[in-house]
């Protein structure tokens, strides 16, 4: 980690944090005196207060999805179609989470037609080009790895009592075996992403996807050079390449 910058921006993946908090207490939910489930509010507040106390951000915002379809849904109707609707007990807590953020004067950013990831990415890119900022994207979403740079990091909340993990550019490259952060999405395109209902190429898992991107650099270059592949792998890429674009 570098010395503390003059400006530290923390961008919360709000909906993901709410889901995470809700299911962390799923088997033993926290309820108030009226029997109302408040697990998500409690867990969300704990994470937020921990960040404020220990990370001391100078700037902070919380990004959320909306129910409106995005360009991704229009381009690929099956996008996230495998996801179940929000649990009612979590849905009931969302207004309380918004009230908590409003009471703490933390901006709530949500725009119809855009996912929280889009807003997080926009903020991260703006801050990345602004002198004096270090940006921390608070999320478990591996898609956000493509935004990591020398001044932008993925701040992953801890699991089961473990401390959080900060993914910097060096760690990202080591984990994925890549040279550039944007190659994360190329690997995910090939191997698929079940959380977003992205199928990927049949028979191509993480190991093969890493090898292909390591050799060709991008999905686009891979599809332009299938003559360099052999056997079953060549057949799979040539017959199913459109599934990765």
Task: Label every PLM stretch briefly.
Residues 3-6, 56-61, 129, 149-153, ...:
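Non-catalytic nucleic-acid-binding/docking modules located in mid-to-C-terminal regions
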Residues 2-138, 142-170, 243-245:
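Noncatalytic, basic helical substrate-engagement surface that gates or grips nucleic-acid strands
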């Amino acid at each position: 980690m570098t010395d503390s910058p003059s400006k530290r921006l923390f961008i919360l993946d709000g909906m993901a944090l709410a889901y995470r908090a809700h299911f962390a207490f799923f088997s033993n939910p926290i309820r108030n005196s009226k029997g109302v489930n408040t697990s998500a509010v409690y867990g969300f507040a704990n994470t937020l207060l921990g960040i404020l106390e220990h990370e001391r951000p100078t700037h902070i915002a919380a990004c959320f999805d909306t129910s409106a379809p995005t360009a991704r849904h229009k381009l690929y109707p099956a996008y996230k179609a495998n996801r179940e609707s929000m649990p009612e007990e979590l849905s009931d807590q969302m207004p309380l989470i918004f009230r908590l953020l409003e009471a703490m004067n933390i901006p709530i950013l949500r725009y119809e037609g855009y996912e929280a990831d889009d807003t997080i990415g926009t903020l991260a890119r703006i801050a990345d080009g602004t002198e004096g900022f270090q940006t921390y994207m608070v999320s478990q979403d591996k898609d956000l790895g493509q935004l990591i740079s020398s001044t932008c990091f993925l701040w992953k909340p801890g699991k089961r009592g473990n401390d959080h993990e900060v993914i910097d550019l060096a760690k990202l490259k080591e984990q994925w075996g890549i040279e550039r952060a944007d190659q994360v999405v190329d690997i995910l395109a090939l191997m698929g992403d079940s959380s977003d209902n992205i199928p990927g190429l049949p028979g191509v898992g993480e190991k093969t996807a890493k090898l292909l991107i390591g050799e060709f650099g991008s999905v686009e270059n891979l599809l332009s050079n299938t003559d360099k592949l052999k056997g079953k792998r060549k057949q799979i890429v040539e017959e199913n390449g459109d599934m990765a674009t």
